[in-house]
Amino acid sequence: MQQVLIDTFIVPEESRAEFLENTRGVQEFLKTLPGFVEGYLYEKKDGANRHNMITTAVWESEEAYENARKAALAEYQRRGFNPQELARRLRVEGERGVYERSPY
């Protein structure tokens, strides 16, 4: 069964450009991994100079997702990239969930 990684973020206006630059870099890497099906970024500006963002990445299977997760962690380490530190510095709030996808 397909696995869907769904991340939700609240991004301050002043952090938006840097956050998107880093997010798009991660997305470009994920697209190269075996088992990647599709991914999207959704964005909605709220009235408080913040942006609500959702990113999704769909994987063929649980195994493909797990392999991608490990590959992403290795790539972060290779680049010296720490997503948690970036989120703290940019004052981005986030939450992650992994869901099974099935048609309805």
Explain the meaning of each model-derived region:
Residues 1-4, 15:
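Short amphipathic alpha-helical segments, especially helix-boundary/capping motifs
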Residues 10-21:
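Short, surface-exposed ligand-recognition loops at beta-strand->loop->(often short) alpha-helix junctions
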Residues 3-10, 40-72:
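Short, well-ordered beta-strand segments in beta-rich or mixed alpha/beta enzyme
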Residues 25-37, 58-95, 104:
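An amphipathic, aromatic/His-enriched active-site/gating alpha helix that lines ligand/cofactor pockets
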Residues 43, 98-100:
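A general secondary-structure junction signal
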Residues 15-16, 27-28, 43-45:
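Intrinsically disordered, low-complexity segments enriched in polar/charged residues with Gly/Pro
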